Curated annotation (Swiss-Prot):
Organism, as annotated: Synechococcus sp. (strain JA-3-3Ab)
First and last residue of the signal peptide: none
Keyword tRNA processing: no
Name the UniProt record assigns to this protein: 5'-nucleotidase SurE
Residues where a divalent metal cation binds: D8, D9, S41, N99
Gene3D superfamilies found in the cross-reference section: Survival protein SurE-like phosphatase/nucleotidase
Root EC class: hydrolase
UniProt gene name: surE
Keywords (A to Z) from UniProt: Cytoplasm, Hydrolase, Metal-binding, Nucleotide-binding
InterPro entries xref list: SurE (IPR030048), SurE-like_Pase/nucleotidase (IPR002828), SurE-like_sf (IPR036523)
Cited Pfam families: SurE
EC number: 3.1.3.5
């Protein structure tokens, strides 16, 4: 398979290097890595519009058969440039990850990892966003093995149409993971707290902090699945239309406004 890999943790991140090495070890894959040249977490689907993108080849830390690039742009820039500027032909898969930290519930709206995978889907390419649900756990091998298992399953039973699968892996050994489950996005709420500081020149600046204040209790949610030791798999789509609201909104009689 021809696979394009990106992330939002940057080209130096352990997760993307582990994933590229695992795919290369299997053999039979043409692997291209295009990642930000620095940390780009929580950049969402931002694109670089007002300055050029620059890329540099990266060899250290990747198997020799993997072509890797560091890009000055966002995660979405990386995938877009990879598809339209660096690859000679469209890949079979776009994979974003392995991210350090979960991308669960409504957090996907901020996620550079999920947005990188979504960019692949917007180009009609099936995509995976893969995250290790811990900011401190450093063993990415189980998550890499989950990716290999998913690709094998999907090669035997291909998707009916391209889609994005958001995959969150609990920070456990492979033998400890209880299985894979389909799960819906949870609704996560935070205490958004900006910590005010003052620089040596007396000018105020702010750091965003916050903690989850309400965890999902729905047993079908991705948050619950990962908490119970399962790999959560959530199909995502770019269409954010709230179709269920159409009926109630039609009662407004919009045509009567004279548009």
């Amino acid at each position: 398979m021809n696979i394009l890999i990106s992330n939002d943790d940057g080209i130096q991140a352990a997760g993307v290097r582990c994933l590229a090495a695992a795919l290369a070890q299997v053999g039979g894959h043409q692997i291209t890595v295009v990642c930000p040249d620095r940390e780009r977490s929580a950049t969402g689907h931002a694109l670089t519009l007002h300055k050029p993108l620059r890329v540099d080849p990266v060899r250290e830390g990747f198997p020799p058969e993997v072509q890797a690039w560091a890009c000055s742009g966002t995660p979405s820039d990386c995938v877009k440039l990879g598809l339209d500027g660096l690859l000679q032909q469209p890949p079979d898969w776009v994979i974003a990850g392995i991210n350090q930290g979960a991308n669960l519930g409504t957090d996907v709206l901020y996620s550079g990892t999920v947005s990188a995978a979504m960019e692949g889907l917007l180009e009609g390419i099936p995509s995976l966003a893969v995250s290790l649900a811990s900011f401190t756990h450093q063993d990415f091998q189980p998550a890499a093995q989950v990716v290999l298992m998913l690709l094998e399953k999907l090669s035997l039973k291909p998707l009916e149409k391209p889609m994005l699968l958001n995959v969150n892996v609990p920070p456990l050994g492979l033998a400890e993971i209880r299985g894979m489950v389909l799960a819906r996005l949870a609704w996560r709420k935070y205490t958004d707290l900006y910590e005010k500081r003052v620089d040596p020149r007396g000018k105020a600046y702010y750091w965003l902090a916050g903690e989850v204040v309400e965890e999902e209790v729905d047993p079908c949610s991705d948050v619950r699945a990962v908490a119970e030791g399962y790999v959560s798999i959530t199909p995502l789509q770019p269409d954010l239309t709230a179709y269920a609201a159409f009926e109630s909104l039609q009662r407004w009689g919009l045509s009567a406004f004279g548009f």
